[in-house]
Structure formats: structure tokens, C-alpha cells
Amino acid sequence: MTRETLKTLQSTFGEMVASFVFGFAVYSALLGSALTEQSAARVIVGLTVGFSGICVIYSFCDVTVAHFNPAITLAAILTCKLGVLRGIGYIVAQYIGFILAVCALLPCSPVGYKETLNIIRPTPSPFGGDNLNVFFTEFFLTAILVHVAFATAVNPYKPKTDTEGKFVDPDEEEPVDRRITAPLCIGLTLGFLAFLGLASSGGAFNPGLTLAPVIMSNTWNHFWAYFAGQYLGGFVGGLLQVLVLYKLSF
């Protein structure tokens, strides 16, 4: 087995574990805040999403892309920022990681199998959200997340240089090193987005988080609205950053 193959396997496995850790954290927060009837349930979940996202990115970015979100990975593939085969491998690993997170949560839950899955499965708001509300909410939330992920990590700005290493644009300045701040920025984005879908979709903006409890419960209500909104929003957010909002360098 070649060194490159081993690195690919490690990276793919790392993406699965990253998805597992993130998924287990979010599902646990959803379950715990629901069962204890916390008045600050959404705050608990939002903080968990944000802080766990920061920790997972910092912990796994040396061995994998640390997307733990198929919408980000697919957008990276479609904008040619990630190889097709490797990207598909990451997406499969992400889904497996989230499914394993659900499986790990079940023996930890004090309530039954079905009740646990009903709690952690994304559902429209009780205020009367329909499929159209869900679709547009997930579309915009995922587009924002993917744009931030692209701007800070997937496709950050790199000024053009000549053969001597000098900037082509004489007005160019040394770019900001985002390697340290990118996980913080993405994690904070995950956190505030978790509060924005309360009136409609609940705010999932991650096909992996959405699909795992849906598969385990075999309950597919509103699934297409979540999935379509997340993947389409992710693609639009990534494409916008690559083609329109990537800083011009002359």
C-alpha cells in the first residue's frame, strides 16, 4: 500500500470520525434540552453547534478537510476545489459518521428508540412551517455557511505573484493568515445560524445531520425540502464566493 493511499484512507476515516463527534454532540444537546424541558433549549443547542464545530475543525484539520457537512464537500467538488473521487469518499464517510452518532446516542438515551429519533430528527416549526418555508430557510442558511467556509478555508484569497515572488498588483498587501481564525469564524457561523431557522425549519443546514435520524426512523416527511435546500444553497454559496466574491487581483 502506497503512502498516498494510506494518507487518503486516514483522511477519509478522519472525516468520518469528525462527523461522528460533531453529530453526537449536536444530537445529545437536542435530546438533553428536550427531555429536561430547558427554557433555553435553543441557546444550548446553538452553543453546542458552535463550540463543537470549532473544536472538531481544530482537532481534525491536520488529517482531513474537516467539513463534516456534505453540502460543503459537494460545493467544493462542483467548483473544482476538491477532486471528485476523494470528495465522494468524504461525503460517504460523513454520512456514515452521522449514522454512527445516532447509533451511539440511542443506548445513552433514557427514553425509547422512537422517541429519541423523533426528538433529534429535523422537523418544521410548530408555528406552521411548510415545505416551502423549510426549503428557503435551509437554502439561505446553508448558502451562508458554505460561503463563509469557502472564504476562510476552502478557497481563501491568495494574491498573484510573479516569478520572483513579488505581488503582481502593486497595491497588494500581505494577505491575512486565516489558518488560525478560520475554525473560529466557521464555528461562530454555525452557532448563529442555529438560531435563524427557529420559525420555520429549525435550522439544520447539514444534509448529514438531517439524513441520519431520517434513515434510522424511516420517517421521510419534509425530507426533500431539507435536502434540496441544503445542497442547492451550498452550491450557490460556494459558487458565489468563487466567481463573484473572490477578491480581484490584477
From Swiss-Prot:
Which intervals lie on the Cytoplasmic side per UniProt? 1-15, 64-86, 155-179, 246-250
Localization:
Cell membrane
Does ATP-binding count among this protein's keywords?
Answer: no
InterPro entries on file:
Aquaporin-like, Aquaporin_transptr, MIP, MIP_CS
Q: What is its main location?
A: membrane
Q: Which CDD domains match?
A: MIP (cd00333)
State the function annotated in the UniProt record.
Water channel required to facilitate the transport of water across membranes. Involved in osmotolerance.
Query: What name goes with this protein?
Result: Aquaporin
> Coding gene?
AQP
